[in-house]
Design a protein with these regions (language model features):
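M16 family metallopeptidases and their MPP-like homologs
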Residues: 3, 7-40, 46-94, 107, ...
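Short amphipathic beta-strand starts and helix->beta connectors
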Residues: 55-60, 152-161
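Short, polar/flexible loop-turn hinges at active-site or ligand-entry regions and domain interfaces
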Residues: 93-101
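Short conserved segment of the HATPase_c
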Residues: 118
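Non-catalytic, conformational "gating/processing" segments within enzyme and secreted inhibitor domains
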Residues: 127, 155-183
Length: 183
């Protein structure tokens, strides 16, 4: 989907695909979120630092998020840098390298986030509400996983999830800004 808007020399990309936390195996809750968080940590062509240097040097941004049903992405750049942004998006979605050292750093960040959430009464109330309301339904499960499930996730799980759930089937991509639809 494309919409031209030449009020600014920038473009915004946004999209989603079927890879939300509903696809997490019961014993590996948080897998979808882990994969989404890992996409920008390195690809087969670029390291974590290289990706961020490319984005920073062009003033662009690119990020990923996970929901219950879908995972998504958002990016912004100058119109002239749209090919660069789309190439990085494509690399992150189709060629993530899941480097071991970066995955362990990310695992520790996720575990720290879970520990902080465990101290937040609002978070705990929401989690308890979901468990009571949805019982045995996947909606009762924590999207971010548990400390135990995050510890069980191996690099091979990340690779398998990405290969199985990421791809053009069902993906929606919108580009809005200083670009012609034909571009």
């Amino acid at each position: 989907l494309t919409r031209s808007n030449f009020n600014s020399p920038s473009v915004v990309i946004s999209g989603y695909f079927d890879a939300g936390s509903l696809f997490d195996p019961d014993e590996k809750l948080g897998l979808a979120d882990f994969v989404t968080s890992a996409l920008m940590r390195g690809t087969k062509k670029h390291s974590f630092d290289e990706i961020y240097n490319i984005l920073e040097s062009s003033g662009a941004s690119l990020g990923f998020s996970t929901g219950v049903h879908k995972s998504g992405f958002n990016g912004r750049s100058l119109a002239e840098d749209l090919p660069l942004l789309l190439n990085l998006l494509s690399e992150a979605l189709t060629q993530p390298s899941f480097p071991k050292a970066e995955m362990e750093k990310l695992r520790m960040q996720i575990l720290t986030g879970l520990a902080i959430s465990a101290e937040d009464t609002s978070e705990m109330a929401s989690e308890t509400f979901d468990k009571i309301l949805y019982k045995d339904h996947p909606y009762s499960r924590p999207d971010e996983g548990t400390p135990e499930s995050i510890q069980r996730i191996a690099r091979e799980d990340l690779v398998k999830f990405q290969r199985g759930c990421y791809g053009p089937r069902g993906m929606v991509l919108a580009v809005v800004g200083a670009v012609e639809a034909e571009d």
